[in-house]
Amino acid sequence: MENYDILIKNCQVLNPDMNVSSTCSVGIKDTWIKKIGSADEFVDSVATETLDGKGKLVMPGLIDGHTHTCQQLLRGRVADEYPMVWTRFLVPFESNLLPEDSYVSGQLACLEMIKNGTTAFADSGGVHMERVADAVIESGMRAAIAKSTMDMGNAITGAMKETASEAIDHTKELYKNYQGAGDGRVDIWFAIRQVMTCSRDLITMVGECAKELHTGIHAHLCEHKDEVSFCLQKYRKRPAEFLDEMGILGPNLLTAHNVMLSDHDIALMAERGVKMIHCPRANLANHGFPKAPQILEAGASVGLGCDGAAPSNLDIFDEMKVLRYSMLAYWGLPSFNPVVMTCPTLLKMASQGGANAIGHGDILGSVKEGKKADLILLNIDQPHITPTQNLVNTIVDAANGHDVIDSIINGCLLYTSPSPRDRSLS
């Protein structure tokens, strides 16, 4: 007789190859996916908690590869504003946050992500990130957390204005106190806010410290043309080339946005094993169309991010749709290529690509025996999803965070959506 912590019965599973299984059951034990098999294989099994999987799809938890949890309280403020939004709104706002503000903002972000099927995220940092880490630990989520580091530029104000040494010391302290916290769910990374606000000294120190502590680096890169222009004028190199010269490009680097990349940039970053994150809605609203198909063709690992709640929401399902149709319109239609950005590719970005980006591709990103039980159950027995002749296509085109019924992180059931009757009664 096999004992499980959670047993999901009579469900369908999204396999790592993006095909959907026939009806099966999933056994979870000690934070891991222990067994996936037919109902007959679980006939003698017992579980602490049993979930009815009928009409549900078990899929990997989505991973938000680039967000700003400290901007949760800024929702709705930056839409329809003239550039530069980050200097006029984001940095001044973050600079004035109190520790309790960052904590509450972190709590709200975690709650929204869990409800929308996101089980892990990478935060490129703000202020008082120790309080964000507290919120993550309490929520049960998984996260790679960095502290925003900047030491130059007229846009830096208040609590975000530091010397290079101060910025590094603060991240080291965060690492000392929180690395591996929450049963291993929290990782502490270093950050390069962007090349326009980080000196050579700071970038060098970030690279050295990340290497010494065997951790990651989170950077905004090639987000907008001003950044590229700055680099060309100051360093006579494009941003990716400059960071490569500084020894930063490598497998432990996560770059967000990646809009203004040249073909040489793409080849260089793919060769170095850089993990790239696209933020479709943020990119289209402020920066332009990324070369996502070309980046994938170069063999780079690509994930998706929401870039925080300030302009919209924290729903990776929405990001998949926006990237799909923007790439079809911009790259597909001119060459009559309807498969320039396929639905299975987008689902892989939202799961496996994100797992690679946060350094856990070996244990996260797919529903497979021996991987961590970071799973979501999607209600597919609904009129906007069923019937369908291709469930994977329909998930990308029609599903959203409201279709998430259950969220399991690290083997713990953190969220169960109330039934329609329960919602009406409440």
Segments and roles (model prediction):
Residues 77-141, 167-182:
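Alpha-helical scaffold segments that flank or form the walls of functional sites
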Residues 415-422:
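Conserved small/polar residues in nucleotide/adenosyl-binding loops
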Residues 245-252, 293-382, 397-399:
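His/Asp/Glu-enriched, well-ordered alpha-helical/loop segment
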Residues 73-104, 147-165, 225-250, 275, ...:
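Active-site gating loops and adjacent loop-to-helix segments of metal-dependent hydrolytic enzymes
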Residues 1-6, 13-59:
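Histidine-rich, glycine-flanked metal-binding segment
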